[in-house]
Regions:
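Flexible C-terminal active-site loop/helix
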Residues: 2-20, 25-38, 342, 358-438
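Metal- or metallocofactor-binding catalytic centers and their adjacent structured scaffolds
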Residues: 18, 56-132, 138
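Conserved, mostly hydrophobic/aromatic
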Residues: 30, 59, 81, 120, ...
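Short N-terminal binding/cap micro-motifs at the start of the first secondary-structure element
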Residues: 40-45
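Short beta-strand elements
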Residues: 46-54, 398-401
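Shared catalytic-loop signature of beta/alpha-barrel
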Residues: 79, 83, 95, 269, ...
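Proline-centered loop/turn at the N-terminus of a beta-strand
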Residues: 135, 149, 250, 301, ...
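Metal-dependent enolase-superfamily TIM-barrel catalytic cores that perform enediolate-based chemistry
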Residues: 147, 152-293, 297
Length: 438
């Protein structure tokens, strides 16, 4: 009895039901799922490989990822998702996505569960592209452009790493890591040498830079009440860049959701003089009414927010008019399948989409595929330090910014593979599920 006959003998549901409860099983079958937490490179990352075989014995491997609480996400994949996925049709992407999304949302599973779905979805889209010999953006209806405009966000090689790896690091992504002086440490340089950093980015072809200049104020003062001196401190790098370089580079501010409504207004009104392209997450998106009040009371564009992870959360923001643009992380909202839904919804409101990446190479590639197939995407975030120092240790493809753009991936699938040496079965962060074990 071959592998396909064994699966057919074990499961009689050859096709999906209208509820998607039974996975469609007539195409290339999922034979194994591997996950890895690369603690020594990016400890917050979960890398995934999905193995597939068709009836003629041909094999493929799909690649995906997500970021944050990776061990918990791996448990969701292996302990909950794998019984549905193993032996099922790898190309039944919508069936898998709809069933797993509805099961997770039914019990408020918008953390590790939605990240797990995102990682699986990326891998399945990668497989679809490989099997059909097309890049994902082509399967999504693209191209709508040949390359995607990018900006640099103020992370560094030490961003998001533990304080065991980098002494003094907070170990909490998005929590105001000050960085340290050194090559590519843009979180440090954006505060201490902002003009020099801006010049360097312009020379490298970047069109924009996002600063985290109020994070230090928050670490010292908290976010409930700031003085005029505090506001001036956070504004200083922006003023220095504008005074030295004028409008040669777009400037944005990420507030990481640290501030109260009153303080957020103070910051926004002070920022008007430096003409930012947008303000991002100056306050948390917890209350839609507060977000609307904030946007209506200022004259600076507002971006909201990779802190949102469900389609319904973005819908409420768009319906209420709480944002001038939305930011999406593809590996937090349900993968390619979730991201394209949200980006297309935003188009109905004439609100542009921004793609997030501080989180991993497959996240960045997924954003490029969405941008390559959706005219509403305006900008792709990058962290040049990650492109230069971390991503080369993870994937087999170089991602190079040229003239402020990244080219659309032309390779079939997502456009890269995990480095083969990452998935060592003896690695402490490795897990595998297949038909024999989980």
């Amino acid at each position: 009895m071959n592998t396909f006959e064994k699966w057919d003998d074990q499961r009689t549901d050859l096709a999906s039901s209208v509820t998607q409860q039974h996975a469609y099983r007539r195409g290339p079958r999922i034979t194994a799922i591997e996950t890895l937490v690369p603690h020594d490179i990016m400890p917050g990352l979960l890398a995934i490989r999905v193995h597939v075989q068709d009836a003629d014995g041909r094999v493929w491997m799909g690649h995906g990822e997500t970021y944050y609480v990776p061990t918990s996400v791996a448990s969701v994949i292996h302990d909950f998702f794998s019984p549905r996925l193993l032996g099922s049709d790898a190309l039944a992407i919508e069936s898998h996505w709809r069933f797993l999304y509805e099961r997770m949302i039914a019990f408020a599973g918008t953390g590790a569960e939605l990240r797990a779905l995102s990682a699986i979805d990326l891998a399945l889209w990668d497989l679809a592209g490989q099997i059909h010999q097309e890049p994902i953006w082509r399967l999504l209806g693209g191209p709508v452009r040949d390359s995607v405009p990018v900006y640099n966000s103020s992370g560094g090689p030490s961003y998001g790493r533990s304080n065991k790896q980098v002494p003094g690091a907070s170990g909490w992504p998005g929590h105001g890591d000050p960085g340290k002086q050194g090559p590519l440490e843009d979180n440090w340089a954006s505060i201490n040498q902002p003009v020099e950093l801006a010049k360097e980015l312009i020379d490298l072809g970047y069109r924009g830079m996002k600063l985290w200049s109020f994070d230090g104020v928050y670490r010292r003062q908290g976010g409930q009440l700031l003085t005029a001196r505090d506001i001036d401190e956070g504004l200083a790098p922006f003023r220095q860049i504008r005074n030295a370089l004028g409008d040669q580079i777009d400037l944005m501010l990420d507030g990481h959701g640290f501030f109260s409504l009153g303080v957020a207004r103070q910051i926004a009104r002070a920022m008007q003089e430096v003409r930012p392209l947008w303000l991002e997450d100056i306050l948390r998106p917890d209350c839609i009414h507060t977000m609307v009040e904030f946007r209506k009371s200022i004259d600076v564009p507002v971006a909201v927010s990779e802190m949102l992870v469900t389609i319904d959360a973005y819908r409420r923001v768009l319906e209420a008019g709480a944002a001038d643009m939305i930011m999406i992380d593809p590996t937090w909202v349900g993968g390619i399948s979730g991201t394209r839904r949200i980006a297309e919804l935003a188009q109905a409101y004439n609100v542009p989409t921004l793609m997030h990446d501080c989180t991993g190479p497959m996240t960045l590639l997924a954003g490029l595929h969405i941008a390559g197939s959706n005219t509403g995407v305006a900008y792709q975030e990058t962290v040049r330090a990650h492109l230069a120092t971390l991503y080369p240790h993870l994937i087999d493809t170089e991602l190079r910014v040229e003239s402020g753009h990244l080219e659309l991936p032309m390779r079939p699938g997502i456009g890269a593979s995990w480095r083969a040496d990452l998935f060592d079965s003896k690695h402490p962060g490795y897990r595998r599920s297949d038909s024999g074990h989980r």
